[in-house]
């Protein structure tokens, strides 16, 4: 799946046959299709053909930087670059990132809504969990509540716990049962209409160490002060 945006603002989509009807429902009207699945050529020859319609020595930007996707293998990209040496292949990540920073009112509303849903579910979770439940049980309740409250899907959910704290926040929830003095963290990424929220919450079980409470309160106060800026 490729989207070609010319300097003059014209947009062309290159998509596999299975994606044609979906793209036709958007504002994009200039669409070219390749028959897929085709492991030997998933659109790369079509992409090369379109690039060749541009003047030689043109700059062809690809998203090559942080948090970007080529939508092709590195091997395929290097082959295209080798076959089209009369063009300048450059990293356009900075352009895309600068555009992504600008949000329309509708985009902001989508982000606000998915964040509000997730915050509400986090707040209600305290009434549904207790000592003796496992990380997996708690995570399952949380995920179900997210869906029931309107998010489209959960991109990821990590969960960890331990006495006075935890040592990682990247793994899936385990069968570990929450005991006295445990701190549980849930870190989630939920989406709505393609827009994303990413934040976490901590929950204390039983008698929590005073140093842990003090550290939490300091972080809370620092966050609140920052939000006032």
Mark where each language-model region is.
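Active-site neighborhoods and metal-handling regions in enzymes and metal-associated proteins
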Residues: 1-229
């Amino acid at each position: 799946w490729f989207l070609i945006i010319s300097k003059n603002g014209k947009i062309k989509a290159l998509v596999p046959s299975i994606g044609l009807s979906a793209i036709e429902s958007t504002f994009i009207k200039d669409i070219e299709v390749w028959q897929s699945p085709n492991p030997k050529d998933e659109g790369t020859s079509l992409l090369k053909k379109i690039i060749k319609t541009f003047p030689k020595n043109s700059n062809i930007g690809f998203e090559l930087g942080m948090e970007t996707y080529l939508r092709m293998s590195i091997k395929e990209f290097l082959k295209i670059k080798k076959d089209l040496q009369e063009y300048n292949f450059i990293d356009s990540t900075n352009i895309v990132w600068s555009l992504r920073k600008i949000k329309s009112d509708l985009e902001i509303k989508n982000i606000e809504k998915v964040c509000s849903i997730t915050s509400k579910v986090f707040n209600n979770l305290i009434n549904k969990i207790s000592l003796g439940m496992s990380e997996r049980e708690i995570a399952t309740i949380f995920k179900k509540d997210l869906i029931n409250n309107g998010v489209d899907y959960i991109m990821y959910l990590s969960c960890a716990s331990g006495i006075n704290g935890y040592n990682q926040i990247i793994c899936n929830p385990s069968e570990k049962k929450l005991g006295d003095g445990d701190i549980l963290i849930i870190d989630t990424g939920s989406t709505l209409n393609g827009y994303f929220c990413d934040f976490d919450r901590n929950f204390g079980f039983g008698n929590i160490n005073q140093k842990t409470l003090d550290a939490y309160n300091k972080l809370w106060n620092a966050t609140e002060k920052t939000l006032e800026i």
